[in-house]
Amino acid sequence: MNTVRVTFLLVFVLAVSLGQADKDENRMEMQEKTEQGKSYLDFAENLLLQKLEELEAKLLEEDSEESRNSRQKRCIGEGVPCDENDPRCCSGLICLKPTLHGIWYKSYYCYKK
């Protein structure tokens, strides 16, 4: 019976010591995996940040082009002479020949539509 106890004790000690070694190895593996995961997440985060910055630059560029092109160029106000062939009247105005007053000037003027 003594040999059974000694054998059992020996097996128990071996199991505990090997189990702790596995536990330490598992802990080390988990730390390595989390470090790799962090580096992967950092890489993915940087890649996403670059894509967002590129997209933002494109959007800002389009906005500046749009505002530059949509801005109304210098225009002629109401009651100001204009050229019949090249009217530059402001929006909401049209280049017409004057009625009654101003007919002696023989010129076109910008009037409201």
From Swiss-Prot:
Keyword Iron among record annotations: no
Location(s) in or outside the cell: Secreted
Location of region: Disordered: 61-83
Keyword Signal part of the UniProt annotation: yes
GO MF entries: sodium channel inhibitor activity; toxin activity
InterPro entries: Toxin_22
Cleaved signal peptide residues: 1-21
Disulfide bond entries: C75-C90, C82-C95, C89-C110
GO cellular component: extracellular region
Keywords for the protein's UniProt record, in alphabetical order: Disulfide bond, Ion channel impairing toxin, Knottin, Secreted, Signal, Toxin
Tissue: Expressed by the venom gland.
Pfam families (alphabetical): Toxin_22
Function: Probable ion channel inhibitor.
Family statement: Belongs to the neurotoxin 14 (magi-1) family. 01 (HNTX-16) subfamily.
Protein name: U11-theraphotoxin-Hhn1g
